[in-house]
Amino acid sequence: MGRERTYHIKQYPLEKGALEIQYIEEFFGEFDRKKTATEIQKRLASRDHCILMAEARLPDDPSLVVPVSFKVSHEIFFEEQDPHLADLVSRLAGAIDFHGRRILYSWIGGTRSDWRGQGHFRALTEQQESWALEHGFKEIVVKTKNKFYGMRATLTHLSFDVIKYERNLLDNRDSKVYVSKRIGPEVLSRHQSERTLTQAV
């Protein structure tokens, strides 16, 4: 039996993390619109957030370590001032209980195509869950689209449950899918990835 793989994860402060996310999103052609560092900083500056990135060595040059997967999450509130987040919260009405509970929104994330299927996204998700529990969050919410079949399958495999489906009548592939996962100590006991975490400076 082979040695279990260790995933190397880095957690970023806001300013540096925003720049790193702007860079890595250039590798994702499937994204409709890529986020700018300024946009990321504006969204996250006034709320608790977590910026995580998985790194791996290049197969053809092991001396080089590159970012291969990322996950950005932040708190959402029942009463939001930001119009986009207020719309999100209104769509979650009846599906998520905000009363006396901290809710974490997994905003953006993905894995570069050459590194998919290797467990990086699971490792990031499990690290995100550990962070969420440590900071008192009770549930993680993710919004995706029906056409991102790989992402939906991964989220299902990671025990995220569908809580709402918004059908797009023009093209069902563009229908919005909302999934969530309740966070507690029992969730951490089911984690499978071996991880190291470092803080970027």
For the regions a protein language model found, what residue spans apply to each?
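Short amphipathic alpha-helix that is part of the acyltransferase structural core
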Residues: 1-67
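Short hydrophobic/aromatic beta-strand element in the GNAT-like acyltransferase core
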Residues: 49-55, 70, 103, 108, ...
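Conserved acyl-donor/pantetheine-binding loop and adjacent beta-alpha core of acyl/acetyltransferases
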Residues: 61-108, 169-171
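Polar/charged side chains located within well-ordered beta-strands of beta-rich proteins
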Residues: 71-73, 106, 125-129, 155, ...
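Conserved GNAT acetyl-CoA-binding A-motif
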Residues: 102-103, 132-145
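Conserved acetyl-CoA-binding loop-helix of GNAT-fold acetyltransferases
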Residues: 111, 117-130
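Conserved catalytic-core motifs of GNAT/GCN5-like acyltransferases
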Residues: 141-144, 156-177
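C-terminal "cap" of GNAT-fold acetyltransferases
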Residues: 167-201
